[in-house]
Amino acid sequence: MTLDIEEKEEIVTSLTKAEIHLSGLDENWKRLVKLVGNYRPNRSMEKKEPYEELIRAVASQQLHSKAANAIFNRFKSISNNGQFPTPEEIRDMDFEIMRACGFSARKIDSLKSIAEATISGLIPTKEEAERLSNEELIERLTQIKGIGRWTVEMLLIFSLNRDDVMPADDLSIRNGYRYLHRLPKIPTKMYVLKHSEICAPFRTAAAWYLWKTSKLADYTKPVRPKKH
């Protein structure tokens, strides 16, 4: 299922408001928005279920996209319908078959936990998820083995299209703040949380701009401390 015309128009309006809001915060944000350009996030136009997104997220952890796609294609090929495996299929799937797809033992454990959580109702449907707040979803989904806060934040941003999410523990975000505020070293998670409060209710847009800083001409990599 894809978004209808009215929903797409709402997204466009939200993008424009985000740019205006961030540009008006201070000179640092004004400069960053001007350098990066218009806010063009990778919004999900398909209404995929949280179960599917979480399975994909865990399956691709610590892998290059090419390797992750190869593993996932093998995984889908062993499904009864040749499409995305159902929670029941993953729950009942033989360990060695999943290993043959390329999954580590740890990932298999996590994938089966996600399947069980979907069957039990802990993982909500897309419709149910849209009625829950960001923190309610984070609290609920991080109970599942292999699912951390960052993974849920990516679900909120890229699948549920939430406008006010700041992945404060993301290293690229922290590096973005180092660039934005011209800091001598990478700031802490708490620094990001504190200084991103002014970006509400458009912290997702702020995160997008911070992610883009590494592509700017005057961006410099953080200096690593010298080994003695």
Curated annotation (Swiss-Prot):
The active site is at D170. Its EC number is 3.2.2.21. GO terms for cellular component: nucleus; protein-DNA complex. The record marks W150 as: Determinant for substrate specificity and/or activity. It is an enzyme of class 3 (hydrolase). It comes from the Eukaryota. InterPro entries: Alkylbase_DNA_Glycosylase/TA, Alkylbase_DNA_glycsylse_CS, DNA_glycosylase, HhH-GPD_domain. One of its GO terms (molecular function) is DNA-1,N6-ethenoadenine N-glycosylase activity. It catalyses: Hydrolysis of alkylated DNA, releasing 3-methyladenine, 3-methylguanine, 7-methylguanine and 7-methyladenine. Keywords: DNA damage, DNA repair, Hydrolase. SMART domains: ENDO3c. Hydrolysis of the deoxyribose N-glycosidic bond to excise 3-methyladenine or 7-methyladenine from the damaged DNA polymer formed by alkylation lesions. Can release ethylated and propylated bases from DNA in addition to 3-methyladenine. Belongs to the alkylbase DNA glycosidase AlkA family. This is DNA-3-methyladenine glycosylase 1. It comes from Schizosaccharomyces pombe (strain 972 / ATCC 24843). The gene is mag1.
